[in-house]
A protein has these predicted regions:
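N- or domain-start disorder-to-order transition segments that initiate the globular core
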Residues: 1-6
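Non-heme Fe(II)/2-oxoglutarate
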Residues: 7-106
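Catalytic core of non-heme Fe(II) oxygenases with the double-stranded beta-helix
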Residues: 80-177
Length: 177
């Protein structure tokens, strides 16, 4: 997994961040994407969030809902590895001690650890023509007394074209630009 230097990370505006094309090995990303399509055939082109297939996807979506107990939630995260081994490999790689050490070196933040609950994390998808509003993710964990220090977004869109839109944008604090 590619990283940038600490100097480059902290020189980004309006907030320290990194954007790395081909961050992960492309063959791993392609295999993960293909697994998601095999498990959820309408992954690439679905338009109806209420379809039966779409509802079934929630079975593997590792986001803790308020009506789910911890065992079900953790089981679902673990199920991802058995159903989609390459996706599971990415999850494992990005939560590994080695990766956390690299993030720590790049950011200068010591004692990083991952959220074993994946609260607010996991696999997210925007439908064709969909939109995700500009927002700020929570800072305080919804269950534990932890502060979020780093977000990581990994896009799995092979052959993505800039004219499609959907670019990652960093806005200023008052969301005016």
């Amino acid at each position: 997994y590619e990283m940038v230097s600490r100097e480059e990370y902290y020189s980004q505006q309006p907030f320290p961040h990194m954007v790395v094309d081909n961050f992960a090995p492309i063959d791993l990303i392609n295999r993960a994407y293909k697994e998601l399509i095999e498990v959820w055939p309408d992954w690439a082109y679905a338009t109806d969030p209420n379809s039966e297939r779409e509802q079934n996807k929630k079975e593997f979506y590792p986001y803790r809902n308020s009506n789910e107990d911890e065992k079900i939630y953790i089981k679902r995260v673990n199920d991802m590895e058995s159903v989609c081994p390459h996706v599971g490999q990415i999850f494992n790689d990005l939560t590994s001690k080695d990766f956390l050490e690299k993030l720590g070196e790049m950011t200068g933040i010591t004692n990083l650890f991952t959220d074993p609950y994946f609260a607010g994390g996991g696999i997210h998808r925007i439908y064709t023509g969909g939109h995700l509003n500009v927002h700020t993710d929570y800072m305080l964990h919804p269950v534990e007394p932890w502060y979020r220090r780093i977000n990581l977004l990994l896009y799995l869109t092979p052959d993505w074209q800039e004219e499609w839109g959907g670019n990652f944008e960093m806005w200023n604090e008052d969301t005016t630009e």
